[in-house]
């Protein structure tokens, strides 16, 4: 979730684009009708590849046995994705096996080593960190939108809210 830097209320994403380094830049607006501040936020995806974040899963031993007994011409299962992770034990290539979402910000991913002699199964925790970069003025927002899309000027809409007290 993204929170407004002015009032602390929940904000929603208006526009988003990805940078070359994998960072997602978002233009967000506060949902509070009295604030409605517009600001720029950033979302970074990175995983914890430290040894402390990886652990051996003993309950997955049966998959290791099937890798050990397989022939040399064994093909990789289609559901596994090639990743940049290396096995902690033999430093071989590790493939993504399964993943599950623990919360909105944390995903638990299971990897398996492709070496038939090793077959280690380990897990990593991938976190999504959201942080506010800097506030964006409405003029800056309009300039950025016109630079990217080169659209005609956008007319500002006025919204009226009525509160009913009982």
From Swiss-Prot:
Pfam family, one: Ogr_Delta
Gene from which the chain derives: Delta
GO molecular function, a single term: DNA binding
Superkingdom assignment: Viruses
Origin species: Enterobacteria phage P4 (Bacteriophage P4)
Annotated function: Positively regulates late transcription from 2 promoters in P4 and 4 promoters in P2.
Protein name as catalogued: Transactivation protein
Family annotation (InterPro entries): Znf_Ogr/Delta
Record keywords: Activator, DNA-binding, Late protein, Transcription, Transcription regulation
